[in-house]
């Protein structure tokens, strides 16, 4: 693992254009070398874009692997590069929505879905804004130590372990003026989740956004990072959500998924398709991904 970190260190010393090209190559290779993830991505796209042809979905998935390869090769930038270099690669759009809320003394939750440029954007944002964020412990000890070191490189973030739960989040938000960075769009199982639609499919979704907003009186401000053709990233902030929370947790969680879906449709190749977003199914419904092992052997694309 330390050897991999050294490789990333030397990669970040390359010109940015070369890092992008190397990442694109790695993504292309991964598309063909990791059939299990390829299958998961294809199942997700079939569920979300059933009206598309197989050719369209395959083209988008290949582009998504390219984006993921770039994300992977950029980790050296996030961990080792000069902070000013990172800042130059990220531009803000409508950041006044966040600035105005913080200036008014509001508690803020940044709704921050998993787009492929999310790491680069947040490493730039954290230079300007202190953040509260969740952290999932890595299985590999060396990786866990490196990720934590990277997260704390500006001494401007407070991390809460995912196992600490809602109470730890509320406690930290109440004693801090920092926004809470909320990444909501993964399947953590049926416990403490609700089923609401995502691209028309019932999907286990954590209703934490509504509950945390209600318990802290926080304003919800979405922030979406998108990558441009030159590799730079635009982090766009959206207006504070009005009438949120509404008192109806299901309606609030559906509103969140609808917003994320709308943003995904704008940049579908940049959304994170390689995890099992639809893994947990309602009672009696079969596993969408159960053919993964067979498909991994037979899919030659």
PLM regions and their residue ranges:
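Membrane-anchoring hydrophobic helices of lipid-metabolizing enzymes
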Residues: 1-112, 144-148
């Amino acid at each position: 693992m330390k050897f991999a970190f050294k490789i990333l260190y030397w990669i970040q010393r390359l010109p940015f254009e070369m890092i992008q090209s190397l990442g694109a190559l790695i993504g292309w290779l991964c598309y063909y070398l990791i059939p299990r993830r390829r299958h998961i991505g294809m199942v997700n796209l079939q569920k979300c874009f059933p009206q598309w042809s197989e050719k369209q979905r395959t083209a988008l998935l290949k582009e998504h692997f390219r984006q993921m390869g770039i994300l992977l090769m950029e980790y050296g930038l996030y961990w080792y590069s000069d902070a000013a270099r990172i800042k130059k690669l990220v531009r803000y759009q409508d950041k006044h929505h966040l600035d105005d809320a913080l200036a008014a003394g509001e508690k803020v939750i940044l709704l921050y879905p998993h787009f492929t440029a999310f790491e680069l954007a947040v490493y730039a944002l954290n230079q300007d804004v202190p953040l509260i964020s969740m952290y999932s412990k890595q299985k590999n000890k060396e990786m866990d130590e490196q990720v934590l070191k990277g997260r704390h490189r500006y001494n401007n973030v407070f991390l809460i372990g995912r196992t600490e739960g809602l109470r730890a989040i509320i406690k930290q938000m109440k004693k801090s003026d920092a926004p809470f960075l909320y990444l909501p769009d993964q399947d953590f199982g049926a416990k403490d989740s609700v089923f609401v639609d995502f691209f028309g499919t019932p999907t286990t979704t954590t209703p934490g956004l509504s509950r945390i907003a209600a318990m802290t009186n926080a304003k919800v401000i979405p922030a979406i990072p998108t990558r441009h053709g030159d590799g730079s990233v635009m982090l766009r902030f959206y207006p504070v959500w009005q009438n949120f929370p509404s008192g109806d947790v299901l309606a609030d969680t559906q509103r969140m998924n609808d917003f994320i879906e709308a943003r995904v449709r704008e940049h579908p190749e940049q959304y994170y398709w390689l995890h099992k977003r639809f893994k947990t199914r309602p009672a009696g419904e079969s596993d969408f991904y159960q053919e993964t092992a067979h498909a991994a052997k037979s899919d030659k694309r």
